[in-house]
Amino acid sequence: MLGIVKMEGHETTDWSNYYQDTQEAYSSVPVSNMTQGLASMNTYMTMNPMSSSSNMTAGSFNMSYANSGLGAGLSPSGMSGMGAGSASAMNGMGSGVSSMGTALSPSSMNAMSAQQASINSLSYSGMNPGMSPMAYGPSNMNRTRDTKTFRRSYPHAKPPYSYISLITMAIQQAPSKMLTLSEIYQWIMDLFLYYRQNQQRWQNSIRHSLSFNDCFVKVARSPDKPGKGSYWTLHPDSGNMFENGCYLRRQKRFKCEKQQGGKGSQDGRKDVSGPSSPLHRVHGKSSQMDSSSSMSNPSSSPQSLEHNGSNGEMKPQVAAGPSPLSSHQNHSTHSLAHETHIHLKGDPHYSFNHPFSINNLMSSSEQQHKLDFKAYEQALQQYSSYSGGLPGMPLGSPSMAGRGSIEPSALEPTYYQGVYSRPVLNTS
């Protein structure tokens, strides 16, 4: 509007400078030439087909200039020259506007209307279900909920009580505080509808619960109450296993003290019959072997046993003559030690301090030296592949065969240090 006001303030000669484009220059728009301007605008609008949105924008932009020019032409300054021929000029203007209206009619906008129709045709119903997530909404909302038929209703559901809880409830509600097995079954079936089916399964569980729990005690029938089956009642020392009347979970487990006492007495008897003296506790296996050897030896006197028993030490004396059993044990011990030493290929100078070591089990020093030389021979055979053997001293030489003439310094680890790149004693 400010531009229009400024254009009205200037003279008609300055308007040619304001509009630089020759096609849109409507500076001299008298009333007599208004029809020619509108006709040129009509031809300009009809020459540009409105097949796209860009052409439509250009047409609307040119139409706005036409309206501004039209408004300027109809201003009071431009109307001053209007005379008797104003009616004919206005008729020409009306025809020009009508032609412009026909140019802007839907018949000339077929391309744009077709494009708009194609855009409007892209509804959610025609889209891919992955592109229109709301397409499934109405179908889900309009679906009627299916009425499901449950297998059993709520009263037929399994009760949240254990079998011990059911038995305890049945016994506690009885006037005599004891019931037979059939009465317990009947009470459970009357109270809970779930247990009216599959009776074979849960009745077996009831019997197992009665038999393997110390809180239930079987009471024999009295002569004044004939019938079948014994009575079951709660143990008098069981107390209140279900605190605050809550049978959902048993708070404490009852164990009969009499059975525990019987087990403890049996364990005590086993301890008494077992070895009790310090000698047996320290030398358990050796004392048993010595006692067995003394029992097998008939020459041992009972007086010596009584004398040793009075001193508080159980040391059975063995006769001076060696028994066949003891000699057999010594022979087996030596053979076992010999086999063990063959399998062990470690450092022969490493000594074990415990009493069952190989060095302590070997009786003679000669056997010890033989085993040491055997270990060295195995070590030399193992490392002969790396060094190619000693120069001038093969393994089968007489000097190597004479094991008794080897100096004691040869037994030291530093003796072979200059000969081999690796120490001989570390065979593992």
UniProtKB/Swiss-Prot annotation:
Region entry Disordered, spans: 257-337
Basic and acidic residues bias spans: 257-272
Compositional bias annotation for Low complexity: 286-304
Main location as per UniProt: nucleus
The name this protein goes by in its record: Forkhead box protein A1
Organs and tissues of expression: Expressed in the endoderm of mid-gastrula embryos. At neurula stage, expressed in the notochord and in ciliated cells of the epithelium. During tailbud stages, expressed throughout the endoderm as well as in the notochord and neural floor plate.
One cellular component (GO) term of this entry: nucleus
SUPFAM superfamilies in the record: Winged helix' DNA-binding domain (SSF46785)
Keywords from the named record: DNA-binding, Nucleus, Transcription, Transcription regulation
Residue ranges with Polar residues bias: 324-335
Species whose genome carries this gene: Xenopus tropicalis (Western clawed frog)
Annotated function: Probable transcription factor.
Gene name tied to this protein: foxa1
Stored InterPro entries: Fork-head_N, Fork_head_dom, Forkhead_box_C, FOX_domain-containing, TF_fork_head_CS_1, TF_fork_head_CS_2, WH-like_DNA-bd_sf, WH_DNA-bd_sf
GO MF, one annotated term: protein domain specific binding
